[in-house]
């Protein structure tokens, strides 16, 4: 279990706004999280958990 993620391996969970999961094994939480990400972002499609759309997103620049 990831000390920075409140879930057991394989279970579903959600990333907090700060997303400190580094080695998360959850099925619904990825290692990389974008706090803002437009729909269709290539990086988000590769595993980012998007928390909201924004035109000021830096993770897809």
Swiss-Prot record:
Positions of the region Beta?
A: 1-29
**Residues that bind a divalent metal cation 2, according to the entry?**
7, 13, 15, 26
Query: Does Electron transport show up as a keyword for this record?
Result: no
Ligand binding (a divalent metal cation 6): 37, 41, 44, 60
Disulphide-bridged cysteine pairs: none
InterPro entries under this entry?
Metalthion_dom_sf (IPR017854), Metalthion_dom_sf_vert (IPR023587), Metalthion_vert (IPR000006), Metalthion_vert_metal_BS (IPR018064)
Sequence positions that bind a divalent metal cation 4: 33-34, 44, 48
Q: Which residues bind a divalent metal cation 5?
A: 34, 36-37, 50
Residues reported to bind a divalent metal cation 1: 5, 7, 21, 24
**Entry-linked SUPFAM superfamilies:** Metallothionein
Gene Ontology molecular-function annotations: metal ion binding; zinc ion binding
As stated in the Swiss-Prot or TrEMBL entry, residues carrying the post-translational modification N-acetylmethionine are 1
- Residues binding a divalent metal cation 7 are 50, 57, 59-60
Domain comment text?
Class I metallothioneins contain 2 metal-binding domains: four divalent ions are chelated within cluster A of the alpha domain and are coordinated via cysteinyl thiolate bridges to 11 cysteine ligands. Cluster B, the corresponding region within the beta domain, can ligate three divalent ions to 9 cysteines.
How does this polypeptide assemble, per the annotation? Answer: Interacts with EOLA1.
Q: Which family does it belong to?
A: Belongs to the metallothionein superfamily. Type 1 family.
What's this protein's name? Metallothionein-2
The record lists the organism as: Homo sapiens (Human)
**Gene name of the encoded protein:** MT2A
């Amino acid at each position: 279990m990831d000390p920075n993620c409140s879930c057991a391996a394989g279970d579903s969970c959600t990333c907090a706004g700060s997303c400190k999961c580094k080695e998360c094994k959850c099925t619904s939480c990825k290692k990389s999280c974008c706090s803002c990400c437009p729909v269709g972002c290539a990086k988000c499609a590769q595993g980012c958990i998007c928390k909201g759309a924004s035109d000021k997103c830096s993770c897809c620049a």
